[in-house]
Regions:
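Adenine nucleotide phosphate-binding catalytic loops in nucleotide-utilizing enzymes
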Residues: 24-32, 36, 65-178
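Flexible active-site lid/hinge loop adjacent to a nucleotide/diphosphate
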Residues: 1-79, 117
Length: 178
């Protein structure tokens, strides 16, 4: 690592190991060990942002010296429900909104105000936005700043080339993704 401790670490998923075969990472277990390193290096005052719906990622929670913010589309997922019941920070989808909650406190961000999700229709982008919201919250970024960033972010070839860039061309929608 290029740092000793971090205030926020984010692990979005391990899944089926989409990046296997790169840099001697050949198994899902190898990938989990590698991604867990940043969780282990969270400052005691910091947060690990973990996907509650990915069991390998959720299992990283005990390795974090700081606190955990779990995120998942399903707020009723057992990991999410337990974490919420304990009054801890969670980020989830409720209808047409992303909700950040801690105890009885809630902040809501409407998906219609987050262009990258296309009104919540692009599920993996909703997941990415939940992780981004949790990370920004973990460093106490003001909610107005978080909203402004989400509403103004455009996933185009200038800032994220080849990463699910959506373009309209002559009446057709074109997606560039590698």
């Amino acid at each position: 690592l290029g740092f000793d401790r971090c205030q926020v670490a984010v692990v979005t998923n391990i899944g089926a190991g989409d990046h296997l075969g790169l840099n001697y990472i050949t198994t899902v277990e190898d990938l989990a060990v590698l991604k867990r390193v940043i969780v282990q290096n969270v400052a005691t005052t910091g947060y690990a942002v973990l996907n509650a719906a990915d069991p390998i990622v959720a299992a990283m929670a005990p390795a974090c010296p700081g606190k955990i913010i779990f995120f998942a589309s399903d707020r009723h997922h057992p990991v999410m429900a337990t974490h919420r019941a304990q009054g801890h920070r969670t980020v989830y989808v409720d209808g047409d909104s992303i909700v950040a909650s801690e105890g009885s406190w809630r902040e809501t961000i409407h998906l219609r105000d987050v262009p990258i999700t296309r009104n919540g229709k692009i599920g993996f982008q909703v997941e990415n936005v939940m992780a981004a919201v949790a990370a920004a919250w973990g460093v106490d970024m003001p909610w107005q700043t978080i909203r402004r960033g989400l509403s103004g972010f455009v996933n185009d070839s200038d800032n994220a080339p080849g990463r699910f860039n959506i373009m309209d061309y002559r009446g057709a929608t074109v997606i560039a993704d590698y």
